[in-house]
Amino acid sequence: MKYALVTGGSRGIGRAVSCKLAEMGYFILINYQSNDAEAEKTLQLVQEKGSNGEIMKFDGTDPAAIALALNNWASQHPDEYIEVLINNAGIRKDNLMLWMTGEEWNKVLDISLNGFFYVTQHLLKNMLVKRYGRIVNIVSLSGIQGMPGQANYSAAKGGVIAATKALAQEVAKKKV
């Protein structure tokens, strides 16, 4: 069986990607942090597409929570690995820089940029050992050109874009 993890998979883009991967025959691991009902709805939609999945609730900004959830999954699936990772989790807390709080800045970067790092780093070793993996990072035009009121979001998405380019150079020869 082929497994795909979609962070922020309970709604919006994450839900749409989960459904598309389900159509492609993947077992979908739907990550989310807070909205149980929406995660259940995404799981139902995945099943309606003829595939299956499971809900994987963890805080993508907490390395210990990520490790616990993914290690638990791995111990229940010792002969399997997650071959597709969709880093989709992210939030916007728009505000002009002049009035932006440190919390608004840090929360956006923590979820979008640090979450990408923590989850990707955890899954990367198995992809490299198996010599196959796909990592798709959902970003925004805001990460390329910046948008007023989105200094935090632009910085986070721009960071993911740059990290994606660097990571590709590190792992492409290993078919990841």
Regions found by a protein language model. Name each.
Residues 10-12:
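Conserved glycine-rich cofactor-binding loop
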Residues 36, 57-69, 102:
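The beta1-alpha1 cofactor-binding region of Rossmann-like NAD(H)/NADP(H)-dependent oxidoreductases
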Residues 82, 96-97, 104-109, 135:
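Substrate-binding pocket helix/loop in short-chain dehydrogenase/reductase
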Residues 98, 145-151, 173-174:
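Active-site loop immediately N-terminal to the catalytic Tyr-X3-Lys motif
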Residues 120, 156, 164:
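Active-site helix of classical SDR
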Residues 125, 169-173:
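Alpha-helical segment proximal to the catalytic Tyr-Lys
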Residues 140:
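Residue(s) in the substrate-gating loop at a strand-loop-helix junction
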